[in-house]
């Protein structure tokens, strides 16, 4: 049915204005409060999601101090001769000094056909017709040994099969070696060779051997190679070591040795005060970011700018989830203790103290003093806190994981939001029905008023006519 529209001509009343005012009043009383609540809930959810992001950032900074990372103090490896051997250390490394003699380096295997070619598009074996048996046109390589072994076979199709095609087909089939074309001539007079290089050092994965050569590939019979070899070194107090790589991380716990050349050097492992301090500063910054965010979004302010004094709630003012998360972090910070420490037992002993606003203050000089006197106690203290906060099942995980405490709060709010949206929609329909009903009632009133006016005019005319005739 088309919407009724009228202007109160018969009654002289602006009925549309009355209807509009009635509708606006109904919306103000029944819709606006729900829409205001909707906005508040959506802001709360946005703030809770942001809190989750900040908690994850805190967890990332603390994961560097967990038991899984090796403890709460960073370590550094140094070498008396980096040109022979370098060293990197994880937090789990034990302080010490190691005399190392490198006898030989691990290297990969290289293999090349002795045949040279004038162009990268030159045929690999120009004498082929393609009618030969496939086995006579196939070259096969075995790469690696034992469980790490793979076999790569390339079938040369005919005399037009180029060296570039061979390289492409080999590289498609191989995972432990790579073929390439190398110019062993000059720029003006190039001379190309096909070279196959192992991608792994050492004999276990890096050995390359040509295990089959088709009878029709006579030009590929001759070859040159440089065999793969293992690294060899000796470490004082440990003995002789042979490995298939020049990066060795399974001899000294927490330490990776990077071999560079034959020779002797001394490697030392010690606390890395600078890195530990920098990581601690990152933790303090992430922790304080959470404290400030919760404080800023937990305010209830007074608004007396209008006719009535109103309380204005910040996004987290009606949520308890943020408060409980912050309380859990503070509880862990205050309860963490270094087991076995004499002078270093709590966070205040390493320069971390709590300010009146709930943020923490960091004295880096005090941390470095603690590292000099009791590095083990520092590590145990920080590790204990990090394990309780940053690992799976820890404080942060309980809030940020799927279906964790933040998810529960957000989903509860989403349920309320959906319910309020339904209420608003239904209320809008009710108000529209009320408006339509008012329009119909006023339309009937206008019709009645119009008919009464017509009757009045007719009666007045009749009375006026009768008077004139007498």
What are these regions (language model features)?
Residues 1-39, 52, 60-294, 315-430, ...:
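Bacterial flagellar/type III secretion structural subunits and associated motility module proteins
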Residues 57:
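Acidic/charged coordination and interface sites in well-structured regions
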Residues 184-187, 298-309:
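Short, glycine/acidic-rich hinge or "gate" loops at secondary-structure transitions
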Residues 295-298, 302, 432-449, 453-463:
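Structured, hydrophobic secondary-structure cores that serve as assembly/anchoring elements
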């Amino acid at each position: 049915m088309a919407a009724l529209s009228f202007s109160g001509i018969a009654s002289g009343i602006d009925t549309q204005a009355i209807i509009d005012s009635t509708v606006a009043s109904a919306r103000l009383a029944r819709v606006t409060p729900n829409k205001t609540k909707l906005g508040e809930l959506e802001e709360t959810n946005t703030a809770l999601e942001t809190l989750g992001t900040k908690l994850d950032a805190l967890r990332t900074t603390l994961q560097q101090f967990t038991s899984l990372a090796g403890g709460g103090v960073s370590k550094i490896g140094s070498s008396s001769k980096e040109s022979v051997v370098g060293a990197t250390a994880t937090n789990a490394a034990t302080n010490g000094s190691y005399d190392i003699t490198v006898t030989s380096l691990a290297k990969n295997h290289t293999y090349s056909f002795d045949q040279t070619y004038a162009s990268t598009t030159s045929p690999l074996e120009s004498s082929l017709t393609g009618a030969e048996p496939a086995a006579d046109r196939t070259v096969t390589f075995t790469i690696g040994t034992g469980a790490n072994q793979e076999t790569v076979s390339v079938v040369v199709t005919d005399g037009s099969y180029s060296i570039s095609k061979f390289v492409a087909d080999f590289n498609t089939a191989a995972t432990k070696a790579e073929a390439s074309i190398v110019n062993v001539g000059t720029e003006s007079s190039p001379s190309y060779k096909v070279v196959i290089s192992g991608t792994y050092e050492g004999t276990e994965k890096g050995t390359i051997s040509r295990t089959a050569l088709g009878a029709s590939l006579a030009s590929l019979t001759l070859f040159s190679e440089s065999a793969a070899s293992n690294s060899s070194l000796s470490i004082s107090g440990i003995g002789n070591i042979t490995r298939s790589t020049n990066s060795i991380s399974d001899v000294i716990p927490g330490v990776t040795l990077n071999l560079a050349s034959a020779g002797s050097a001394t490697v030392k492992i010690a606390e890395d005060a600078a890195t530990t301090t920098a990581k601690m500063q990152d933790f303090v910054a992430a922790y304080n970011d959470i404290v400030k965010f919760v404080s800023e979004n937990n305010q209830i302010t007074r608004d007396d700018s209008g006719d009535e004094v109103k309380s204005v709630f910040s996004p987290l003012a009606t949520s308890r989830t943020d408060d409980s998360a912050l309380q859990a972090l503070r509880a862990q910070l205050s309860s963490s203790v270094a087991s076995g420490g004499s002078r270093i037992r709590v966070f205040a002993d390493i320069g971390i103290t709590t300010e009146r606003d709930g943020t923490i203050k960091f004295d880096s000089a005090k941390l470095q003093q603690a590292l000099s006197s009791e590095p083990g106690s520092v590590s145990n203290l920080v590790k204990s806190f990090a394990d309780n906060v940053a690992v799976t099942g820890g404080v942060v995980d309980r809030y940020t994981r799927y279906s964790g405490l933040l998810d529960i709060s957000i989903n509860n709010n989403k349920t309320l939001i959906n319910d309020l949206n339904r209420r608003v929609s239904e209320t809008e329909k009710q108000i529209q029905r009320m408006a339509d009903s008012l329009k119909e009632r006023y339309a009937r009133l206008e019709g009645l008023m119009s008919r009464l006016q017509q009757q009045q005019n007719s009666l007045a005319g009749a009375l006026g006519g009768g008077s004139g005739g007498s």
